[in-house]
């Protein structure tokens, strides 16, 4: 039996891949645009 290695930290996750971080850069905005187009219910972490 293998142990779960992903702990998950809310603050770190938001700082790396949150909505405001995505909107800062051109490529980040492209990510949001693509996810909107695909109809994702959650655009960012």
Swiss-Prot record:
GO terms for molecular function: structural constituent of ribosome. One of its GO terms (biological process) is translation. InterPro entries: Ribosomal_bL34, Ribosomal_bL34_CS. Residues 10-45 have a biased composition (Basic residues). Residues 1-45 are annotated as: Disordered. One of its GO terms (cellular component) is ribosome. Keywords: Ribonucleoprotein, Ribosomal protein. It comes from the Bacteria. Belongs to the bacterial ribosomal protein bL34 family. This is Large ribosomal subunit protein bL34. It comes from Synechococcus sp. (strain CC9311).
